[in-house]
Amino acid sequence: MINCGDVYKVIEAMVPLYVALILGYGSVKWWHIFTRDQCDAINRLVCYFTLPLFTIEFTAHVDPFNMNYRFIAADVLSKVIIVTVLALWAKYSNKGSYCWSITSFSLCTLTNSLVVGVPLAKAMYGQQAVDLVVQSSVFQAIVWLTLLLFVLEFRKAGFSSNNISDVQVDNINIESGKRETVVVGEKSFLEVMSLVWLKLATNPNCYSCILGIAWAFISNRWHLELPGILEGSILIMSKAGTGTAMFNMGIFMALQEKLIVCGTSLTVMGMVLKFIAGPAAMAIGSIVLGLHGDVLRVAIIQAALPQSITSFIFAKEYGLHADVLSTAVIFGMLVSLPVLVAYYAALEFIH
């Protein structure tokens, strides 16, 4: 049962995030410390340095031999349900959109498990719940965030059903002075995929999770410890991962004209996807695979955790609905505690 001390631990984990957010906001809005170009540089610092090292640090310390693979399978099934629904919506609905499907997937599935989920899960269901939340977070970093990067790179490469088959470009021949028309065909699927895989291969967010989980297998199989010099080299930057991400979000907010930059309707949509659609899909996947008791409850609770900060960083870097995801992170953390407590109370009736 949750008591006041447990609630305080959750608040204790969340308040420092808002301190970093306010400092980032004030550095641009009030104190004018950073220019817009410098703000973009800060986002790239977070995206390509602190977050990859943060990912290595927490994935390297998980025990992959003691994971609850039925719980992981339920998570996979819930994501498949969401992807299927979004794909059908994008293809057959008049309002369907490939870009909005990506953002909706992020809102439904990607959670802030480590910062908010761990203290809350421990307060609700004990150490077993903490282990499950950490496993979910590691799997999210390895699979779902990598998948998100793939579709973002795919979108950036320009291959979509909306591409026109040929583009006419007017060019002036300097020698003759005549205007010539050059026809540029769209890239082939193989060319686009080659470009996407090349980008992913050089993106530290992709191979950081692979390095982390590879070391986790090696260290737990042969009982090895990471040398202190390597551990320290990773920690020196990884400790700043969450703080710099929230600081960067504050900077993004300060650069916008409004505090709620995406508007009320999109904010409500984000909250519905985050706290209703995601947990509902997880509940279906968990029940289908036979989860029960506290494992079922933890599965649903962790799906209702606030929005992943990393999803905002990627959205900002790739220019896709960063306003919606920043609002989802900020307001999601504000409303998450009462929502999760309500879920906790309701799930007590499930056996």
UniProtKB/Swiss-Prot annotation:
One of its GO terms (molecular function) is identical protein binding. Auxin transporter regulating intracellular auxin homeostasis and metabolism. Mediates the auxin transport from the cytosol into the lumen of the endoplasmic reticulum. May also act as an auxin efflux carrier when located to the cell membrane. PIN5 and PIN8 may have an antagonistic/compensatory activity. Involved in unfolded protein response (UPR) activation. Involved in the control of vein patterning. Promotes vein formation. PIN5, PIN6, and PIN8 control vein network geometry, but they are expressed in mutually exclusive domains of leaf vascular cells. It comes from Arabidopsis thaliana (Mouse-ear cress). Keywords: Auxin signaling pathway, Cell membrane, Endoplasmic reticulum, Membrane, Transmembrane, Transmembrane helix, Transport. This is Auxin efflux carrier component 5. The chain crosses the membrane at residues 7-27, 39-59, 71-91, 100-120, 132-152, 210-230, 234-254, 271-291, 295-315, 329-349. InterPro entries: Auxin_eff_plant, Auxin_Efflux_Carrier, Mem_transp_PIN-like. Disruption phenotype: Defects in lateral root initiation and in root and hypocotyl growth. Increased levels of endogenous free auxin. Expressed in elongating parts of hypocotyl, cotyledon vasculature and guard cells. Detected in root pericycle and root tip and at later developmental stages in leaves, stems and flowers. Expressed in veins of mature leaves. It is found in: Endoplasmic reticulum membrane; Cell membrane. Belongs to the auxin efflux carrier (TC 2.A.69.1) family. It is a multi-pass membrane protein. GO terms for biological process: auxin export across the plasma membrane; auxin-activated signaling pathway; endoplasmic reticulum to cytosol auxin transport; pollen development. GO terms for cellular component: cell periphery; endoplasmic reticulum; endoplasmic reticulum membrane; plasma membrane. Pfam families: Mem_trans. Induction: Down-regulated upon auxin treatment. Down-regulated by endoplasmic reticulum stress treatment.
